[in-house]
Amino acid sequence: IYFYNDWRAATPWGHTRPDYGRPEVRQFLLDNAAMWLEELGADGLRWDATSYIRTAGGFDGDGSAGIADGWSLLRHMNDELNARFPGRIFIAEDMQHNASITLPTEHGGAGFQAQWDAAFVHAIRHAVISPSDETRSMAAVNNALAFRYNGSAFDRVVFTESHDEVANGKARV
């Protein structure tokens, strides 16, 4: 009863998407996040796969339906956690290059302070591992370094390796 029983249930990890519209689910997730911040003293939280919380297929523009309850949950939790734990950092691993993820909720966004910038890692990784200068794009490196969500250099987290980048037999840089 705490998971969707329709098309919204499907994720790449099975039919396991929680029903973000249920008050019990929302409260459980909020209480869990607060526990990490309050009892364990975490300085922030990184939310995994937020695109799968807010969309059925996990990709903006792929034709899959949005999940309004998921978008509402992200906004609600960021509002609540920011109010209760000022100065903590909330980061989305959204991977869709969607600037609304880091817009404040009062401006229609999800309210995260930063999000992972997947485009950065791919441009830098290609430049570093390319065996030939002919295939290396310094313009792509420049664009990756200069990119900003909402005009802010602090709205993104850049990285050259992550658990996703080196998993499943992929090589490290």
Where are these regions (language model features)?
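Substrate-binding/active-site clefts of carbohydrate-active enzymes
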Residues: 1-66, 77
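Conserved alpha/beta catalytic core and glycan-binding cleft of carbohydrate-active enzymes
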Residues: 41-43, 55-173
